[in-house]
């Protein structure tokens, strides 16, 4: 499901799993957990479709590199009408393009 579709009526997608790509910002590790903002659609650094808080109970390993795009598998949560993601898995290439 696309971000724009979910953003229109987030409650309809409560508990659904999505695989969204983008970039990470404002990352914080607290104990064994990890939280950040996912800049949905910003993998090519051209256009941000939306900002979504993303939380992992266990910090991803290896650590996410904020300088490179990611794809996350996460469950949609809704709080006060806003989309939140409960992360399950992260895909991030080990090398940057051209390395």
Feature names for model-found ranges:
Residues 1-99:
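OB-fold and OB-like single-stranded nucleic-acid-recognition modules
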């Amino acid at each position: 499901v696309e971000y724009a579709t979910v953003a229109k009526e987030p409650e309809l997608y409560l508990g659904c799993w999505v695989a969204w790509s983008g970039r990470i910002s404002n990352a914080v590790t607290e104990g064994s957990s990890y939280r950040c903002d996912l800049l949905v659609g910003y993998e090519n650094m051209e256009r941000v479709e939306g900002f979504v808080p993303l939380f992992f109970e266990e910090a991803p390993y290896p650590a996410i590199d904020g300088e490179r795009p990611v794809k996350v598998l996460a469950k949609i949560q809704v709080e006060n009408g806003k989309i939140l993601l409960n992360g399950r898995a992260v895909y991030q290439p080990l090398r940057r393009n051209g390395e």
